[in-house]
Amino acid sequence: IGTTYFLIIFLIINNSFGQKKLIKSIQLLDSKNNNERIIFSSDEKITVVFDELNNKSRSFYYEIEHFNFNWELSKIRKSEYLDGFDNIRITNYYKSYNTLQPYIHYQFQIQNKNLQLKKSGNYKVTVTDREGRHVFSRKFIIIKNSLNGTIEISKMKDINYQNSHQKLKVNIPCNNCNFNSNTFQYKLIVFKNYNLNDFRLINRPTFKLSNSFVYDNINFTGGVEYLNFDNSNILSTNIE
């Protein structure tokens, strides 16, 4: 089982516990392949699905908020990142049939005829009921694939961490970026296995080459799959 690392560069710019227990199977899916994801390209449609353990449908609404690189609510106006309007009622739902537990399945799309996201960055979708009470929220990221960075994964040099950590070296192409600026404009965020809670935020690169930035010594903890196995002394292997 391998580990996936995802790079993102940012240009700096009521109590409802009772009903939450009834909400199950919340997922953000890419609308093309129905794969659960948290990171989407700017031209992809996102399908949000969830179930409520109930035999009667209710009115739910959703809204979208934009956040900065540090997941703090953006100071930009909604019209700057959203074309259209949100706080839209979810009208696509159906009832379960012949199930031991009755439920209502709801779904809606982000990037639809009423709502288009105009900016890349961090977002949160929030679903509320008719009274405006919070039902659930999910974070996701919209990206524009304008850079092709590379990642090198290697063992830690410190022997105390070789069996528990791994080191990453990231190279980001950037021909026209100013490394010597007092206020460096870019930040690198590396996510492990698409987990928004397991990431590294790097404010400045370690050094700059002629046409790229290099971020060195980015460390992550790893599981047993990263233990080194030396087979250099194995002379032959019999496979039956």
For the regions a language model picked out, list residue spans one by one.
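Low-complexity, Pro/Ser/Thr- and charge-rich linker/hinge segments at domain boundaries
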Residues: I142-H165
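Ligand-binding face of N-terminal immunoglobulin V-set domains in extracellular IgSF glycoproteins
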Residues: L100-T128
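Aromatic sugar-binding surface patches on proteins
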Residues: R89-I90, Y97-Q111, K208-S236
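Internal, hydrophobic beta-strand segments that form the core of beta-sheet-rich folds
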Residues: E65, K118-E131, K187-N193
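Short, aromatic- and glycine-rich surface loops/edge beta-strands on solvent-exposed regions
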Residues: Y62-I64, G121-T128, F220-E240
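Contiguous beta-strand segments within globular domains
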Residues: I23-H66, Y161-C174
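Extended low-complexity, serine/threonine- and proline-enriched intrinsically disordered segments
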Residues: K56-G84, N178-N203
